[in-house]
Amino acid sequence: MTAVGSGTGLAATFATEVRTRLDRIATLAADGGLDEAITLLTEAIEAGAVIQAFGTGHSEAFAMEIAGRAGGLIPTTKIALRDLVLRGGYEVDTLGGSTMERNPNVAEDLWSVSTINPGDVFVIASNSGVNGSIVGMALLAKQHGHPVIAVTSLQHTRAVEPKHPSGQRLCDVADVVIDNLAPYGDATLALRQAHDAALTGGVPVGSVSSITSAFIAQLLTIGIAERIAATGAVPPLYLSANIPGGDEHNSGLERRYEGRIRRGT
């Protein structure tokens, strides 16, 4: 972490931390799994399959960047823990806190209420890469013959113990691993204050995994669209629903994937 004091320089320092990571992700695309993931996902879409995006906690934001948004690909589905409440008979209270995302046993139930077909590819995001539901879903996908792409912090996941009974991390299960370059603990800045004697390294602030993971999601989408367009085909992309003709455009393309994609909450 970068140690900083309070003041107006915090924004500039954080911007530097973010920019440095985004530049590295873009520069290392070929060696960091991004190009391999784009190839895998493009081939799946061209074969009529769907991208299954999954994340828990703040990593659900990654799945939201992949599935069902303006400028995003239409053959995508977001899997979320709340699906167990909406379709699996779980009580609403079970969503509180982090108990559910750490529970490896929910993966089977979540799989049973999801729309998954042969050939679909899973893209699973988890900064820590060790929670039970995340690793459990990755293992289930592999058991059913689906490729798995992981978006995770390699620095963080290698520094913590796995929580899944298998002893595996998300990066151990995945076919392709993309490092979101977040540091251990996610925060990039250590804010020094006179009253924080108990926190000798400073107060951790300025988390970056959501930003870098969203960037990765967009690079994946752009790369897939570019590959499809290069063949002369029109990439199946959403328009904003809040522009004239957006709903009609989107509905028409969604009908091609009827029964294979699901737009949830």
List each model region and its residues.
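Short, surface-exposed alpha-helical recognition segments that flank or form part
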Residues: 9, 13, 28-32, 98-101, ...
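Amphipathic, non-membrane alpha-helical segments in soluble helical-bundle scaffolds
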Residues: 4, 8-11, 31, 38, ...
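Flexible, glycine/charged-enriched surface loops at secondary-structure junctions
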Residues: 30-37, 51, 229-238
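Generic N-terminal amphipathic, Lys/Arg-enriched alpha-helix
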Residues: 1-28
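Glycine-rich phosphate-binding loops that contact phosphosugars or nucleotide phosphates
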Residues: 46, 53-222
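A short, well-structured juxtamembrane/interface segment
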Residues: 26-46
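Active-site phosphate/pyrophosphate-binding segments
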Residues: 70-72, 224-265
